């Protein structure tokens, strides 16, 4: 199987499959990446663990701080105590909440997240209104300037063109 085909199947599996954790598995929130495909995560009860990312997800699926994952425990692990088996996105989280499988420790984060989303929407609406006012003015000062190109100023004056025309007429 080529890399592109493998990536396609892994992404399709992560986005389309709805998985519920088994008795051994648990849902955890990623706190950050420690490098070498190790991620620090916390359970709903507040316990912190190091998790390893399996090779099928490496360079195919990205995990950032605050994402939720389903973890298979590693019983013989010293520092690394779990392996990520599934990455949860918004639709998966809503599905797990409907089933009543979502951990109680993460329930409170939902309400604070919704509050933050509401304030962010209000701020974005205010910014759009401010931008709407500035759009009526033709101000190009906020445009990106490419510093990798030399700035060339072209100045054409009518005097030069008149002189050129007179010289051309004199030659003819």
From Swiss-Prot:
Primary residence: nucleus
Similarity comment: Belongs to the EIF1AD family.
Reported function: May play a role into cellular response to oxidative stress. May decrease cell proliferation.
One Pfam family of this chain: eIF-1a
GO cellular component: nucleus
Disulfide bonds listed in the record: none
The species this protein was found in: Danio rerio (Zebrafish)
GO molecular function: RNA binding; translation initiation factor activity
Record's protein name: Probable RNA-binding protein EIF1AD
Signal peptide as annotated in the record: none
Entry's localization field: Nucleus
Annotated spans, Disordered: 107-172
Boundaries of every S1-like domain copy: 5-89
Keyword Nucleus attributed: yes
UniProt xrefs under InterPro entries: EIF1AD (IPR039294), NA-bd_OB-fold (IPR012340), RNA-binding_domain_S1_IF1 (IPR006196), TIF_eIF-1A (IPR001253)
Domain of life of the native organism: Eukaryota
Keywords of this entry: Nucleus, RNA-binding
PANTHER family attached to this UniProt entry: RNA-BINDING PROTEIN EIF1AD-RELATED, TRANSLATION INITIATION FACTOR-RELATED
Bias type Acidic residues, positions: 127-142, 156-172
Biased composition (Basic and acidic residues): 107-126
């Amino acid at each position: 199987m080529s890399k592109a085909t493998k990536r396609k199947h892994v992404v399709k599996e992560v986005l389309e499959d709805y998985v519920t954790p088994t008795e051994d598995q648990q849902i955890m929130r990623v706190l950050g990446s420690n490098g070498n495909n190790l991620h620090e995560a916390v359970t709903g009860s507040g316990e912190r663990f190091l998790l390893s990312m399996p090779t099928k997800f490496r360079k195919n699926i990205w995990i950032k701080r605050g994402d939720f994952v389903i973890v298979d425990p590693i019983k013989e692990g010293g520092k690394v105590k779990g392996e990520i088996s599934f990455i949860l996105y918004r639709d998966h989280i809503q599905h797990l909440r409907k089933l009543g499988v979502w951990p109680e420790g993460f329930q409170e984060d939902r309400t604070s997240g919704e509050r933050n989303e509401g304030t962010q929407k209000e701020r974005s609406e205010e910014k759009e209104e401010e931008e709407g006012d500035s759009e009526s003015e033709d101000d190009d000062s906020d445009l990106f300037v490419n510093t990798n190109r030399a700035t060339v100023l072209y100045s054409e004056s009518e005097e030069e063109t008149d002189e050129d025309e007179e010289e051309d007429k004199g030659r003819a």
